[in-house]
Amino acid sequence: MLKCDICGKGPLAGYQYSHSHRKSIRKWKPNIKKVRAIVDDTPVRLHVCTKCLKAGKVQRAL
C-alpha cells in the first residue's frame, strides 16, 4: 500500500464492529494522489496525501 512521501501517512488497521459486536478486521486508507512536484529545482513524481496538498507542503510543477 502507498505511503505519503511528505508525512509518511499510510494505511491503518483496526476492527469493524457489527450491530451484534462481532469484530472483523478492516483498513483505513489515506487519500493519496500522484503529483508532479518540484524538489531541488527538478520536477519529480511524488505520492502525496491530500492533507499535505491542502497545507501547501508541496510545490506543484506546471
From Swiss-Prot:
Pfam families with a match to the protein in the record: Ribosomal_L28
Keywords in alphabetical order: Ribonucleoprotein, Ribosomal protein
Domain of life, source organism: Bacteria
GO molecular function, one term: structural constituent of ribosome
One GO BP annotation of this record: translation
GO cellular component terms, A-Z: ribonucleoprotein complex; ribosome
InterPro entries listed in its UniProt record: Bacterial_rp_bL28, Ribosomal_bL28, Ribosomal_bL28/bL31-like_sf, Ribosomal_bL28_bact-type, Ribosomal_bL28_sf
Keyword flag Ribonucleoprotein: yes
Family: Belongs to the bacterial ribosomal protein bL28 family.
Name of the protein this chain belongs to: Large ribosomal subunit protein bL28
Organism: Thermoanaerobacter pseudethanolicus (strain ATCC 33223 / 39E)
Source organism phylogeny: Bacteria, Bacillati, Bacillota, Clostridia, Thermoanaerobacterales
Gene name for this UniProt entry: rpmB
